[in-house]
A protein has these predicted regions:
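Gly/Thr-rich phosphate-binding beta-strand-loop-beta motif of the actin/hexokinase/Hsp70
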Residues: 26-49, 143, 147-171, 187, ...
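Glycine-rich phosphate-binding loop plus the immediately following alpha-helix
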Residues: 57-64, 132-134, 139-148, 172-217, ...
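Glycine-rich phosphate-binding loop signature in dinucleotide/nucleotide-binding domains
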Residues: 78-81, 146-149, 238-241
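Long hydrophobic alpha-helical segments typical of transmembrane helices together
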Residues: 238-284
């Protein structure tokens, strides 16, 4: 009984907080389901009001996701009744239906899903367009709002993906490789004496590490930066020297700053792209 009443008080507190933010339904939610995190953005009158993240938990139930979403909304003083509509993009099919069902528990608003049938403004020149991750398409849409191609999107999560958009605004292909955090974790797990290191800590001043940790930092920070620079040069060779590069996701700042290629980092690139696609399709 004590646990029940504790839960009752907790849930009551949540709903009381949400009640403070009640208003007219004018909030558009964007939901991006990645392999590691679920990113939720809230827009009012074309302005991003909040952006929050949840852990992408494959074991969480619909009800648990509904509670997590409600908590996040309450944290930003948004009531479910304020939601006018929304859009969801996902690279984790197993979670797509669960998160959509959780959203429908909270709101009767219509949620679009990024996929065939939605207009994006980007033509896909790929062997199988259905295989393109929603995050990459949304990133390309947001980057093109800054200006026409050629450009490339660098999306860093568990993997690093780089996708190219040519001067005709066509997404024409790219590369996928393991992200530095994943590679480091695999290396540490499969060796006896290599320690875990913090890739967000500054790399040594010299590429020549003088101890094991410094060698790992140089290898992963400068090595990943050099890898990205090399790929960027190859992208420019195919797309043109004026190619612009955008990055988003969990690529550590240390790696971005070690790159010699000018890269525009935008934390909300995918979120902004989702909202742009919603605007194109809101009356569909």
């Amino acid at each position: 009984m004590l646990v029940f009443w504790g839960e009752f008080a907790y849930y009551s507190l949540i709903y009381n907080i949400v009640d403070v933010g009640k208003g007219e339904p004018d909030m558009i939610l964007t939901v991006n389901i990645g392999n590691t995190h679920i990113t939720i953005g809230g827009y009012e009158h074309d302005t991003l009001i909040f952006c929050g993240r949840l852990h992408a938990d494959p074991s969480a139930t619909i009800d648990e996701y509904a509670m997590h979403l409600l908590n996040l909304l309450s944290l930003h003083r948004v009531a479910p009744e304020q939601i006018e509509g929304g859009i969801l993009g996902s690279v984790v099919p197993a979670l797509t239906g669960r998160v959509l069902a959780a959203l429908r528990l909270l709101s009767t608003a219509r949620f679009l899903t990024v996929g065939p049938g939605l207009k994006s403004g980007v033509r896909l020149r790929l062997d199988n367009p259905a295989q393109l991750g929603a995050e990459l398409l949304c990133g390309a849409v947001a980057a093109l709002e800054d200006g026409p191609g050629p450009l490339a999107i660098i999306l860093a999560d568990t993997a690093i993906s780089m996708m190219a958009v040519n001067a005709r605004q066509e997404l024409v292909g790219g590369v996928i490789l393991a992200g530095p955090q994943l590679s480091l974790a695999a290396l540490v797990q499969n060796t006896a004496q290599l320690p875990q290191v913090d890739l967000s800590a500054p790399a040594p001043g010299s590429v020549l590490g003088r101890n094991t940790s410094a060698c790992l930092q140089s290898g992963f920070i400068l090595g990943t930066a050099s890898l990205l620079d090399g790929l960027a040069a190859r992208f420019c060779a195919e797309l043109g020297p004026e190619t612009r590069f955008y990055a988003t996701g969990s690529l550590p700042r240390t790696i971005r700053e070690a790159c010699r290629t000018p890269i525009c980092y935008r934390e909300t690139l995918v979120t902004d792209g989702l909202y742009s696609i919603w605007r194109r399709n809101r009356k569909a």
